């Protein structure tokens, strides 16, 4: 080793080795990984999806939607990693910072324009997303499902919130405000604050007109859209996808048409 990065200096220092003491080794690794791969997140539009439920669905369907719109797209999810059309096996919800940057770098090589990424509370807590430039963040909902890792629900919520706290001011923070934690996510963010809901007044509001075995008919901000996805929870997912696609510049008519083609 030429240099060792550590949080605590060892008792016996070896000659010829530089020791760099940092407050957080995982945070330092994340910034080093970004720099090593030449900051690949800056060369595409990266959107992080966080929340207890809906992360995989929202990220995967956004990948599908932008592929159908003719773009080169990336996906970092629990199920798989996609570098445009090439599929790789996923190991964690949020891979380690070296893996994330490696795949973002591959996406740069392929000319990928948009990447959608699941962001877990474990990943945020372990600094795996540090050093990445996000175009936007999406908050789906919060329930007591992951308290095996976090000591309290408040800690779990605050870890999620820290993701939005760190978004740059030119990014967007899109949150579900039917979940009472949605507004908490927006408290200290510098990003543009955008809301979506089915029950409350919001920037993007949907109403379920028909709920059938074959799909849902939704009214989204005065426009009707049919989707093959079923269930109330998918109405929220579709709304998050519609809003994100519009925030990323997709034209409304095309957005509605592509949503009607999505399959879970």
What are the roles of these predicted feature ranges?
Residues 92-120:
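Conserved nucleotide-sensing/catalytic segment adjacent to the nucleotide-binding pocket
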Residues 70-84, 120:
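Short beta-strand-centered segment that lines the nucleotide-binding/catalytic pocket of NTP-utilizing
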Residues 122-130:
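Conserved helix/coil segment N-terminal to the catalytic DExD/H
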Residues 2-3, 113, 135:
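Short acidic/polar active-site loop segments enriched in Thr and Asp
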Residues 6, 10-16, 135-264:
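Acidic, Mg2+-coordinating active-site environments of NTP-dependent enzymes
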Residues 1-48, 57-69, 201-205, 260:
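Short, basic phosphate-binding NTP loop
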Residues 86-97, 145-152:
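Flexible beta-alpha connector loops of hexameric P-loop NTPases
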């Amino acid at each position: 080793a030429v240099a060792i990065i550590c949080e605590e200096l060892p008792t016996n220092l070896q000659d010829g080795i530089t020791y760099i003491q940092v407050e957080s080794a995982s945070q330092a690794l994340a910034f080093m990984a970004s720099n090593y791969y030449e900051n690949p997140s800056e060369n595409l539009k990266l959107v992080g999806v966080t929340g207890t439920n809906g992360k995989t669905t929202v990220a995967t369907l956004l990948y599908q939607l932008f592929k159908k719109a003719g773009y080169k797209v990336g996906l970092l999810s629990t199920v798989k990693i996609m570098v445009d059309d090439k599929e790789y096996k996923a190991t964690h919800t949020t891979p380690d910072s070296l893996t994330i940057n490696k795949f973002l770098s591959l996406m740069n090589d392929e000319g990928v324009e948009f990447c959608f990424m699941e962001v877990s509370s474990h990943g945020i807590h372990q600094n795996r997303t540090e050093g990445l430039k996000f175009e936007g963040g999406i908050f789906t909902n919060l329930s007591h499902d992951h308290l095996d890792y976090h000591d309290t629900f408040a800690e779990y919520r605050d870890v999620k919130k820290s993701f939005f706290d760190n978004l740059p001011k030119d990014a967007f923070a899109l949150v579900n405000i039917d979940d009472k934690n949605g507004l908490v996510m927006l408290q200290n963010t510098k990003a543009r604050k955008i809301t979506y809901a089915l029950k409350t007044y919001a920037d993007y509001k949907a109403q379920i007109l028909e709920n059938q075995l074959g799909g849902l008919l939704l009214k989204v901000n005065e426009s009707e859209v049919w989707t093959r996805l079923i269930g109330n929870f998918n109405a929220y997912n579709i709304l998050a996808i519609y809003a994100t696609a519009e925030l990323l510049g997709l034209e409304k008519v095309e957005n509605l048409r592509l949503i009607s083609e999505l399959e879970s």
